[in-house]
Amino acid sequence: MFKKKNVSLAVVRRLPRYLRYVEDLLNHDIMRISSSELSQRMGYTASQVRQDFNNFGGFGQQGYGYSTQVLYENLVKILGLDKNFKMIIVGVGNLGQALANYANFYKKGFRLVGLFDVDPQKVGKSIRNIKIQHIDELKDFIKKNDVDIGVLCVPSEVAQEVANLMVEGGIKGIWNFTAKEIEVKDDVVVENVHLIDSLMVLSYKLNEKLLEKQEASQK
């Protein structure tokens, strides 16, 4: 598959949204869509849609638009969802348990293969038929099972320590839900998820709406 080097992160972050929408089109038996229709429904410009897809070869045909099936298959490959990445969760508190029970991981091709914690009240119990193991077993488990992704749901004060254990075990990517900005070697990919950041963005948008109403009422 053709792919430009150094695709911007902004483009990459739009790809899951494209995939969700195209999947919905297929579920409604819509087999073709133009860039203008796609852009209108998603809130982007047609030029933006074409530029995004051109980073990976384009996928469209002039005068025809996009085959939703072809678009879906290409987006799945671009996002690596055909790789069936193996995933573990470290820290089985409220967030870790919620993620462990999230069925969409399986639907999108991610395989949860391990759960880890230090709490003796949790170790030995199971979630979705996956036994919670003590963190002392983490490194060996990663090595033996060739785990790809480690999900970090531990307290921030131990985040770097646990990340180090993951890396020593041979983890390839870390999905970091802690407030700590962890440091890892260059060949390990990190995606930080700060839930409060998204809430603050919502707060900003809500505040803007309130200010607009206040200004309108004063005119």
From Swiss-Prot:
Keyword Transcription (UniProt): yes
- UniProt cross-references to SUPFAM superfamilies, sorted A to Z: NAD(P)-binding Rossmann-fold domains, Winged helix' DNA-binding domain
Q: What is its main location?
A: cytoplasm
User: Which SMART domains does this chain map to?
Assistant: CoA_binding
| Biological process (GO), any one | negative regulation of DNA-templated transcription
Q: Which InterPro entries match?
A: CoA-bd (IPR003781), NAD(P)-bd_dom_sf (IPR036291), Rex_DNA-bd_C_dom (IPR009718), Tscrpt_rep_Rex (IPR022876), WH-like_DNA-bd_sf (IPR036388), WH_DNA-bd_sf (IPR036390)
Keywords, sorted A to Z: Cytoplasm, DNA-binding, NAD, Repressor, Transcription, Transcription regulation
Q: Which residues bind NAD(+)?
A: G91, V92, G93, N94, L95, G96
Family annotation (Gene3D superfamilies)? NAD(P)-binding Rossmann-like Domain (3.40.50.720), Winged helix-like DNA-binding domain superfamily/Winged helix DNA-binding domain (1.10.10.10)
Report a single Gene Ontology molecular function.
DNA binding
Which residue ranges hold the DNA-binding region? 17-56
Origin, by domain of life?
A: Bacteria
Q: Where does the protein end up?
A: Cytoplasm
Q: Name one GO cellular component term.
A: cytoplasm
HAMAP family linked: Rex
What NCBIfam families does its record include? PRK05472.1-3 (NF003989), PRK05472.1-4 (NF003990), PRK05472.2-2 (NF003993), PRK05472.2-3 (NF003994), PRK05472.2-4 (NF003995), PRK05472.2-5 (NF003996)
Q: What does this protein do?
A: Modulates transcription in response to changes in cellular NADH/NAD(+) redox state.
How would you summarize the oligomeric state and partners of this protein? Homodimer.
Q: Describe the family membership recorded for this protein in Swiss-Prot or TrEMBL.
A: Belongs to the transcriptional regulatory Rex family.
Protein name as it appears in the record: Redox-sensing transcriptional repressor Rex
